[in-house]
């Protein structure tokens, strides 16, 4: 890891509350839960946590309420810098209230809470001390765009990584400042959303299992050539248990299979955020793209063998041990 490499994550912090139920509550019904689990979450917090677990110097820029102090402490215990994590009075930390049924079905209610705290105008302190920026789409888009633009206009520009989850609207995608982006991380469904927004009829997210890799690969190349997109952006497309596709401008689309698991899958919730965090940390270390991605895949393999979003993210030592 370069001693001068530092990542800023601008993103969300949530408290995820899981109500364990015999079935999803029907309209007008009142039932008792069989258990309540409370976990730290939010894509910004999860990804910052993963960068730190992967050995990267990282700071989280976001907001919580007084009820989220324990999440702040959890992030700090992993090595995440929290000087830019604002505590908003008279506001709750972002919430995900999840009904988790015995048959595996779930129902989710989201409340943005402090994540949508946005001073006017958005204050962006100098990004000169950072080399990398990681953003998602769980805070106001205007803030995300401001940070990306500032990163792109810095001298030298920051390496910026965008994981558009939840997905932007078609109009927002067409107006997005792609020229300020270095890397885009999407899954096959999100890749299809982008192509449709840009006027293509291709949709890799609807491909049959045996056609997924070929159609997603073709979709990546089509996206790269689209006039709405920037030809300088690298693309990573995750395919779940099938592995990943990756594209560096000027090169061919590459493929890597998912890592072999040593234990049964317990929870895939945190896999995407684990991947994003480990990917940025790999870039910060100056590793080759293939080596960085192989490390990401092993980290995700360990992640899905455990429960929770943050709790399941492995340390770099654990990943190295499995790679050995």
Where are these regions (language model features)?
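Structural detector of well-ordered beta-strand residues that form the stable sheet scaffold
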Residues: 8, 59, 134, 159-161, ...
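Glycine/charged-rich beta-loop-alpha catalytic/anionic-binding loops adjacent to active sites
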Residues: 25-35, 73, 251-263
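Positively charged, low-complexity intrinsically disordered leader regions
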Residues: 1-27
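Conserved phosphate-binding/catalytic region of the ribokinase-like
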Residues: 1-9, 169-171, 196-324
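Substrate-binding N-lobe of the ribokinase-like
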Residues: 6-7, 27-95, 102, 322-324
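Conserved beta-alpha-beta core of the PfkB/ribokinase-like small-molecule kinase fold
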Residues: 131-218, 242-243
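Short beta-strand scaffold segments in enzyme catalytic cores
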Residues: 49, 95-99, 107-108, 243-247
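Conserved phosphate-binding/catalytic loop of the ribokinase/pfkB sugar-kinase fold
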Residues: 60, 84-88, 96-141
């Amino acid at each position: 890891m370069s001693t001068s490499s530092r990542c800023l994550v601008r993103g969300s912090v949530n408290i995820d509350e899981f109500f364990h139920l015999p079935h999803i509550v029907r309209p007008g019904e009142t039932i008792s839960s069989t258990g309540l689990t409370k976990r730290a979450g939010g894509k910004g917090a999860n990804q910052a946590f993963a960068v730190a677990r992967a050995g990267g110097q990282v700071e989280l820029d976001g907001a919580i309420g007084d009820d989220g102090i324990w999440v702040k402490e959890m992030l700090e215990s992993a090595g995440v810098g929290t000087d830019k994590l604002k505590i908003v009075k008279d506001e709750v930390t972002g919430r995900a209230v999840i009904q988790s049924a015995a048959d595996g079905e779930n129902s989710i209610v989201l409340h943005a809470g402090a994540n949508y705290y946005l001073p006017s105008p958005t204050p962006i302190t100098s990004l000169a001390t950072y080399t990398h920026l990681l953003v998602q789409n769980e805070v106001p888009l205007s803030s995300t765009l401001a940070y990306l633009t500032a990163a792109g206009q810095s001298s030298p520009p920051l390496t910026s990584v965008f994981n558009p989850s939840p997905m932007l609207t078609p109009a927002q995608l067409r107006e997005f400042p792609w020229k300020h982006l270095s890397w885009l991380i999407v899954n096959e469904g999100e890749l299809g959303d982008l192509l449709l927004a840009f006027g293509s009829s291709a949709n890799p997210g609807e491909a049959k299992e045996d056609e997924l890799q070929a159609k997603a690969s073709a979709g990546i190349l089509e996206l790269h050539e689209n006039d709405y997109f920037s030809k300088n952006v690298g693309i990573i497309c995750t395919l779940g248990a099938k592995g990943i596709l990756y594209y560096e401008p000027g090169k061919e689309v590459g493929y890597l299979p998912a890592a072999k698991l040593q234990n049964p899958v317990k929870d895939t919730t945190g896999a995407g955020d684990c991947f994003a965090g480990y990917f940025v940390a790999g870039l910060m270390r100056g590793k080759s793209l293939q080596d960085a991605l192989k490390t990401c895949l092993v980290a995700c393999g360990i992640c899905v063998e455990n429960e929770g979003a943050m709790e399941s993210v492995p340390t770099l030592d654990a990943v190295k041990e499995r790679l050995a």
